[in-house]
Amino acid sequence: GFTLYCETIRPEEYLDFREYVINEYIHYNDYPEFYEQFSLDMHPPKQMSSTQIIGIMHHLRIVGHWCIKMGFTTNRSCDAFTIPAAVQGTPFYLTIEERDKVYNANLQNKPELEVYRDLFIFQSMVGCRVGDLFSFTKDNIVGDILQYLPHKTMRKRSQTVSVPLTTKAMEILKRYDGKQEKLLPTKQVYQYNEGIRAVLRECGINRMVTILDTVTGKEV
Protein backbone atom coordinates (compact mmCIF):
# COMPACT_ATOMS: atom_id res chain seq x y z
CA GLY A 1 0.00 0.00 0.00
CA PHE A 2 0.86 3.67 -0.11
CA THR A 3 0.66 5.97 2.89
CA LEU A 4 1.29 9.68 3.33
CA TYR A 5 2.23 11.06 6.75
CA CYS A 6 1.58 14.70 7.63
CA GLU A 7 5.01 15.02 9.28
CA THR A 8 6.94 13.80 6.23
CA ILE A 9 4.88 14.86 3.21
CA ARG A 10 6.87 17.07 0.85
CA PRO A 11 5.77 19.88 -1.49
CA GLU A 12 6.62 17.62 -4.44
CA GLU A 13 4.01 15.14 -3.28
CA TYR A 14 1.33 17.81 -3.17
CA LEU A 15 2.24 18.68 -6.75
CA ASP A 16 2.19 14.99 -7.72
CA PHE A 17 -1.33 14.79 -6.32
CA ARG A 18 -2.34 17.81 -8.39
CA GLU A 19 -0.97 16.14 -11.54
CA TYR A 20 -2.96 13.02 -10.71
CA VAL A 21 -6.17 15.02 -10.29
CA ILE A 22 -5.54 16.78 -13.61
CA ASN A 23 -4.99 13.50 -15.46
CA GLU A 24 -7.30 11.13 -13.56
CA TYR A 25 -9.82 10.95 -16.42
CA ILE A 26 -6.99 9.77 -18.71
CA HIS A 27 -5.78 7.18 -16.20
CA TYR A 28 -9.36 5.92 -15.85
CA ASN A 29 -9.48 5.14 -19.57
CA ASP A 30 -5.93 3.76 -19.75
CA TYR A 31 -6.17 1.47 -16.71
CA PRO A 32 -9.80 0.28 -16.47
CA GLU A 33 -8.84 -2.88 -14.54
CA PHE A 34 -7.36 -0.82 -11.71
CA TYR A 35 -10.45 1.38 -11.38
CA GLU A 36 -12.90 -1.54 -11.35
CA GLN A 37 -12.35 -1.93 -7.60
CA PHE A 38 -13.80 1.53 -6.97
CA SER A 39 -17.14 0.98 -8.78
CA LEU A 40 -17.02 4.32 -10.61
CA ASP A 41 -19.17 3.27 -13.55
CA MET A 42 -22.01 5.62 -12.58
CA HIS A 43 -19.67 8.56 -11.98
CA PRO A 44 -16.49 8.10 -14.04
CA PRO A 45 -13.77 10.76 -13.66
CA LYS A 46 -14.09 13.64 -16.11
CA GLN A 47 -11.66 16.31 -17.18
CA MET A 48 -11.73 18.99 -14.50
CA SER A 49 -11.71 22.72 -14.97
CA SER A 50 -8.87 24.82 -13.60
CA THR A 51 -11.29 26.24 -11.03
CA GLN A 52 -12.15 22.75 -9.73
CA ILE A 53 -8.47 21.79 -9.46
CA ILE A 54 -7.65 25.01 -7.61
CA GLY A 55 -10.52 24.29 -5.20
CA ILE A 56 -9.24 20.77 -4.49
CA MET A 57 -5.73 22.04 -3.77
CA HIS A 58 -7.07 24.73 -1.43
CA HIS A 59 -8.97 22.05 0.49
CA LEU A 60 -5.85 19.91 0.69
CA ARG A 61 -3.93 22.87 2.09
CA ILE A 62 -6.68 23.39 4.67
CA VAL A 63 -6.12 19.80 5.84
CA GLY A 64 -2.40 20.58 6.23
CA HIS A 65 -3.16 23.70 8.25
CA TRP A 66 -5.56 21.73 10.44
CA CYS A 67 -2.86 19.13 11.19
CA ILE A 68 -0.51 21.94 12.25
CA LYS A 69 -3.19 23.61 14.38
CA MET A 70 -4.00 20.33 16.14
CA GLY A 71 -0.33 19.72 16.92
CA PHE A 72 0.00 16.62 14.73
CA THR A 73 2.94 18.11 12.84
CA THR A 74 5.16 21.16 12.43
CA ASN A 75 5.68 20.36 8.75
CA ARG A 76 4.55 23.38 6.72
CA SER A 77 5.09 21.85 3.29
CA CYS A 78 1.44 22.64 2.55
CA ASP A 79 2.52 26.29 2.24
CA ALA A 80 5.58 25.55 0.09
CA PHE A 81 3.79 25.27 -3.23
CA THR A 82 1.84 27.83 -5.23
CA ILE A 83 -1.88 27.63 -5.94
CA PRO A 84 -2.71 29.91 -8.86
CA ALA A 85 -5.64 32.28 -8.67
CA ALA A 86 -8.80 31.17 -10.45
CA VAL A 87 -9.25 32.74 -13.87
CA GLN A 88 -12.64 34.39 -14.22
CA GLY A 89 -14.42 35.08 -17.47
CA THR A 90 -15.94 38.41 -18.43
CA PRO A 91 -19.21 38.71 -16.49
CA PHE A 92 -22.43 39.32 -18.37
CA TYR A 93 -25.64 40.77 -17.04
CA LEU A 94 -29.31 41.00 -17.81
CA THR A 95 -30.43 44.39 -19.03
CA ILE A 96 -32.97 46.30 -16.95
CA GLU A 97 -35.56 45.45 -19.61
CA GLU A 98 -34.71 41.74 -19.43
CA ARG A 99 -34.83 41.78 -15.64
CA ASP A 100 -38.26 43.39 -15.64
CA LYS A 101 -39.45 40.90 -18.26
CA VAL A 102 -38.46 38.08 -15.91
CA TYR A 103 -40.04 39.78 -12.89
CA ASN A 104 -43.35 40.39 -14.69
CA ALA A 105 -43.52 37.00 -16.44
CA ASN A 106 -46.68 34.96 -15.84
CA LEU A 107 -45.38 31.66 -14.47
CA GLN A 108 -48.50 30.56 -12.60
CA ASN A 109 -48.65 27.33 -14.60
CA LYS A 110 -45.10 26.53 -13.46
CA PRO A 111 -44.99 27.35 -9.73
CA GLU A 112 -41.50 25.87 -9.27
CA LEU A 113 -40.15 28.38 -11.79
CA GLU A 114 -41.94 31.16 -9.92
CA VAL A 115 -39.83 30.36 -6.86
CA TYR A 116 -36.57 30.39 -8.83
CA ARG A 117 -37.60 33.64 -10.49
CA ASP A 118 -38.33 35.30 -7.16
CA LEU A 119 -35.05 34.11 -5.62
CA PHE A 120 -33.09 35.36 -8.63
CA ILE A 121 -34.78 38.76 -8.74
CA PHE A 122 -34.39 39.27 -4.98
CA GLN A 123 -30.71 38.39 -5.16
CA SER A 124 -30.30 40.79 -8.08
CA MET A 125 -31.96 43.55 -6.07
CA VAL A 126 -29.74 43.18 -2.99
CA GLY A 127 -26.46 42.09 -4.64
CA CYS A 128 -25.61 39.28 -2.20
CA ARG A 129 -23.84 35.96 -2.72
CA VAL A 130 -25.84 32.76 -3.07
CA GLY A 131 -24.63 31.42 0.28
CA ASP A 132 -25.79 34.58 2.02
CA LEU A 133 -29.12 34.56 0.16
CA PHE A 134 -30.07 31.16 1.55
CA SER A 135 -28.94 32.04 5.09
CA PHE A 136 -31.20 35.07 5.55
CA THR A 137 -33.96 34.97 8.18
CA LYS A 138 -36.55 37.52 9.28
CA ASP A 139 -33.99 38.86 11.75
CA ASN A 140 -32.01 40.21 8.79
CA ILE A 141 -34.86 42.57 7.88
CA VAL A 142 -35.05 45.83 9.82
CA GLY A 143 -37.91 47.88 8.44
CA ASP A 144 -37.17 48.18 4.74
CA ILE A 145 -33.44 47.45 5.18
CA LEU A 146 -31.62 44.14 4.74
CA GLN A 147 -28.75 43.83 7.23
CA TYR A 148 -26.25 40.97 7.25
CA LEU A 149 -22.61 39.95 7.66
CA PRO A 150 -21.23 38.63 4.35
CA HIS A 151 -19.90 35.13 5.04
CA LYS A 152 -16.94 35.51 2.70
CA THR A 153 -15.42 38.43 4.60
CA MET A 154 -16.74 38.02 8.16
CA ARG A 155 -13.48 36.52 9.46
CA LYS A 156 -11.31 39.30 8.03
CA ARG A 157 -13.72 42.20 8.33
CA SER A 158 -16.76 41.77 10.56
CA GLN A 159 -18.78 44.63 9.12
CA THR A 160 -22.56 44.65 8.77
CA VAL A 161 -23.87 45.43 5.30
CA SER A 162 -27.09 47.43 5.04
CA VAL A 163 -29.05 47.26 1.79
CA PRO A 164 -32.22 49.32 1.23
CA LEU A 165 -34.94 47.07 -0.20
CA THR A 166 -36.64 48.13 -3.41
CA THR A 167 -40.38 47.87 -3.93
CA LYS A 168 -39.88 44.70 -6.00
CA ALA A 169 -37.74 43.11 -3.27
CA MET A 170 -40.36 43.92 -0.63
CA GLU A 171 -43.13 42.45 -2.81
CA ILE A 172 -41.17 39.21 -3.14
CA LEU A 173 -40.70 38.98 0.63
CA LYS A 174 -44.45 39.39 1.17
CA ARG A 175 -45.13 36.37 -1.06
CA TYR A 176 -43.12 34.09 1.23
CA ASP A 177 -43.77 35.69 4.61
CA GLY A 178 -44.29 32.96 7.21
CA LYS A 179 -44.10 30.08 4.71
CA GLN A 180 -40.67 28.77 5.74
CA GLU A 181 -38.08 29.06 8.50
CA LYS A 182 -35.68 31.06 6.35
CA LEU A 183 -36.51 34.42 4.81
CA LEU A 184 -36.97 32.77 1.40
CA PRO A 185 -37.15 29.18 0.11
CA THR A 186 -33.74 27.49 -0.02
CA LYS A 187 -32.30 25.43 -2.87
CA GLN A 188 -29.13 23.52 -3.61
CA VAL A 189 -26.78 25.76 -5.61
CA TYR A 190 -26.81 23.47 -8.65
CA GLN A 191 -30.64 23.42 -8.54
CA TYR A 192 -30.70 27.19 -8.28
CA ASN A 193 -28.41 27.62 -11.29
CA GLU A 194 -30.49 25.21 -13.38
CA GLY A 195 -33.66 26.92 -12.20
CA ILE A 196 -32.43 30.33 -13.33
CA ARG A 197 -31.61 28.92 -16.76
CA ALA A 198 -35.07 27.38 -17.00
CA VAL A 199 -36.70 30.69 -16.05
CA LEU A 200 -34.73 32.60 -18.68
CA ARG A 201 -35.65 30.04 -21.35
CA GLU A 202 -39.31 30.27 -20.34
CA CYS A 203 -39.11 34.07 -20.66
CA GLY A 204 -37.51 33.87 -24.10
CA ILE A 205 -34.20 35.38 -22.99
CA ASN A 206 -31.67 33.42 -25.04
CA ARG A 207 -29.23 35.91 -26.54
CA MET A 208 -25.70 34.73 -27.28
CA VAL A 209 -23.01 35.61 -24.73
CA THR A 210 -19.28 34.90 -24.47
CA ILE A 211 -18.19 32.81 -21.49
CA LEU A 212 -14.91 31.33 -20.29
CA ASP A 213 -14.42 27.59 -20.82
CA THR A 214 -12.66 26.80 -17.54
CA VAL A 215 -11.32 23.52 -18.95
CA THR A 216 -9.58 25.00 -22.00
CA GLY A 217 -9.11 28.51 -20.57
CA LYS A 218 -10.57 30.04 -23.74
CA GLU A 219 -13.63 32.20 -24.24
CA VAL A 220 -16.40 30.51 -26.22
Regions found by a protein language model. Name each.
Residues 48-49, 129, 188:
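Short coil turns linking two alpha-helices in DNA-binding domains
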